[in-house]
């Protein structure tokens, strides 16, 4: 099913990988909604990623912190996707502190030197709120 240019399907929280998240978030179709989302896109993100976000909030993907791309993927899940899934709800900020920890860990490990500009933007995003 397609809607507003984004493919609509759920992610399996048991088999999701950092490339799955990064391929989705950094696709040309998704980029157009980074800072100009719609209620429909927010709902699609919620349907697709809410169970993944819940697992991340429980620490399920903490091993992703060991790589640059894994760190960015985890930050997208913890920091960006909740803002869409829970717009105008304090729950959207529930995992922000976890995202800050991931970002600081990534910087301390020099991962910021491995990332392109777009990924670097989202690595630093939790530190800008």
Feature map (PLM): residue ranges:
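Intrinsically disordered, low-complexity activation-like regions
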Residues: 8-72, 77-88, 93-129
């Amino acid at each position: 099913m397609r809607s507003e240019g984004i493919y609509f399907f759920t992610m399996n929280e048991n088999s999701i990988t950092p490339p799955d998240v990064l391929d989705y978030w950094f696709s040309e179709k998704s980029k157009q909604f980074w800072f100009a989302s719609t209620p429909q896109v927010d709902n699609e993100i919620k349907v697709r990623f809410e169970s993944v976000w819940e697992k991340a909030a429980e620490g399920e993907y903490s091993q992703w912190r060991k790589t640059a791309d894994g760190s960015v993927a985890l930050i997208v899940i913890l920091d960006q996707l909740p803002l869409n899934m829970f717009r105008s709800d304090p729950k959207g900020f529930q995992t922000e502190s976890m995202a800050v920890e991931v970002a600081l860990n990534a910087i301390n490990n020099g991962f910021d030197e491995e990332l392109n500009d777009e990924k670097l933007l989202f690595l630093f995003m939790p530190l800008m709120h």
